[in-house]
Amino acid sequence: KLYIQFAKNFGKLANYPRLKGLNKKYPQITVVQRKESDKGPSFGEQFHTDSIYTKKPPRFTMLLSKLVPKKGKANTEFCSQYYAFKDLTKSMKRKLLSLKGVYSSEGPISVTTKERVKEKGKKIKELKSTHKIIRKISSNYAIYSSPGHLVGFQPKIKNSIDLKKKLFKHQ
């Protein structure tokens, strides 16, 4: 209850679109769990932007850990996408400013999410959306992309795999 009250200080709460919430009383709380039987990358293991595959992704998400694995097993890291944009070459900035990313809930990061969906998910089809890769927020530009969900670019470009690799390495 306190967690929900705290979260409401930042804005309207949203439900995670792929999994059922904790219970009927707290549908906005999603249990993020790694099981011994899971294969592939852990739920959210790679750098990503939460729910980027929705038309209007949440402005923020919060984590509260009940069980913390040993160091190196579940580290949460943060990075500034403002600085990431500033550090791009001029030619890369121009290229990315002209593109939108196509994002999918079935992207490469979705292995464990698919396992959770089978267990206690919502029956929904693939979610896809398109967003500018570079966003202007206030007076600053920032990279807005998610390696685990990016499946293409608009307009389509040659060597998109190379561009994805460069972008993700930079982020």
Language model features by range: what are they?
Residues 1-171:
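Non-heme Fe(II) oxygenase catalytic core, chiefly the N-lobe of the double-stranded beta-helix
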